[in-house]
């Protein structure tokens, strides 16, 4: 439900954003030439302003009817107000002026970037580098109604009847009419190569791509509910980065270049010329700004009529036959090594995060098996599995009867807290060999016999046979004493169990004291000779409890040792067969867990608990399914097969995504690392190569062959 709500909210937000963008574009579409000025503002035209504009247009129309010096009237400029003239556009921009050959006294044309505007000629003296301009739209050209605080209202009030004439410029950026005329040959858009010089180096796009890599990584460790949104965001970031790097520029992004013809001349430092330029060269009234590396070559065209392409900001894009920014980029492409470095570093960062935070073994194996087209195997017998030919990546569905594996201490790899210890039921030995018999132990039998003998004499039951009469036993019990009515049997069973000298030392000393013997060997000889038959020993309750504890502690090591030895004796399966293991440690049997782990039992109960466990797990039903992650055969001929649980659909996609992301990061790091190194080397020599190219074009060297010298 939360996913649906998030989706609906995101869809609603996108719809509102799209509606807002559409309304903004439609509002700007009503004035199509406004799109050239992104920072323009608009307001309504006031009635008094409209009246001043109409008066100015009437005066302009009358002036255009006056014949010029040659007797011809100026070509009429149709400036007629329309419905869109009620909107005033306010902007701050530079004004570019071009001269034309005409009899019209107002022979200048004015441009705001690529938009030609009509500027009242009496305002030419107020033109600055940056101008506060207010425009309205007419049927032909936008009309300037205010320039740097000067309005048509002021003009009509203060200079009514003033003749429209060209006012000589007093600003240093505009030279007088005596300046040489330049010819405007063409207005074109800059080429893609010329645009590349002003285009950013792509650092922002590289950061977007790295951010998309990081989002792809976090998709692997976030909950499934957020994964689609994060993948969508990562794809959008990646697409935005790639689009910014490789998409061709839009037509609106390409600046206009004016193709001029004139005679460039060097002028002294004056007025508004750029003081940072080494060479101060002008074309007519236009102060040219050259690329710094062109300085050695531009003097060849001085004083000669030359074709020059310039931007509206007076930067030169081409001059003469050879100097050309377009040819530079075409023959010596720009080397953006920094963006390749950023992408390579970002790829390495994500790769290290994958190596240290995400287990890669299973994703790689699953992806490779999926690409190879692994098979699905179902088997209920050992022979069926042998015929199938198991390979890594296969999917297995197995069921049958087998034995839970027992590990030796040196090779223990199962769960340390396995409920079936010492059996590991996450590994099943499956073969056709007969089941092993239940383990037996003489030492355990002897220890149990000793414990039972002492327990029977210390805690007699009425139905037990006794060498002492019932009345005497009752009298002894009433007195608070404890009677051992067969002391010799205890000595013999102790000697049978503890044959070594260093075994049961404390128990032997206690029995020697009770038997009033010189040492243990003498006591055993007396017992073997039958001299202890019929000997009764009276014990205080404290002494009886101490004797019972001594027997318990003396027999415990024997039983524990024999239990461990018996478990290891089962760790010898028949040759051949299979060992099916879950690499996640999952139990492969459906057995009830023991209420108490084996080694939590008292030593005297461990043996019987182990036998019950062995009887259950030495031939138990099992079922195993999963994907094969490893297959090998040991020296005993047993084939070891490791299984990993079959992932769900989400798990499959995560494994596949992990592998693909790792491969993509490796390829990206290697490719962009190499590209960064190569581009950096070329970037260092690019300017020298360009200058060498210009030297060869402008100052060619003639090579004379030896044959011509003869």
UniProtKB/Swiss-Prot annotation:
Looking at the UniProt entry, the stretches that span the membrane are 2-22, 205-225, 226-246, 340-360, 657-677
> What Gene Ontology cellular component terms go with this record?
plasma membrane
A Pfam family in this protein? IgaA
Keyword set for this entry?
Answer: Cell inner membrane, Cell membrane, Growth regulation, Membrane, Transmembrane, Transmembrane helix, Virulence
Where in the cell does this protein reside? Cell inner membrane
Q: Which domain of life is it from?
A: Bacteria
Q: What is its main location?
A: membrane
State the similarity comment.
Belongs to the IgaA family.
Q: Which organism is it from?
A: Salmonella typhimurium (strain SL1344)
User: Ranges in the Periplasmic compartment?
Assistant: 1, 361-656
Please identify the protein, giving its name as recorded: Intracellular growth attenuator protein IgaA
Could you list which ranges are Cytoplasmic topological domains?
23-204, 247-339, 678-710
For the keyword Cell membrane, the answer is: yes
In the UniProt record, does the keyword Cell membrane occur? yes
This molecule's function is given as:
Involved in negative control of bacterial proliferation within fibroblasts.
Q: Topologically, how does it sit relative to the membrane?
A: Multi-pass membrane protein
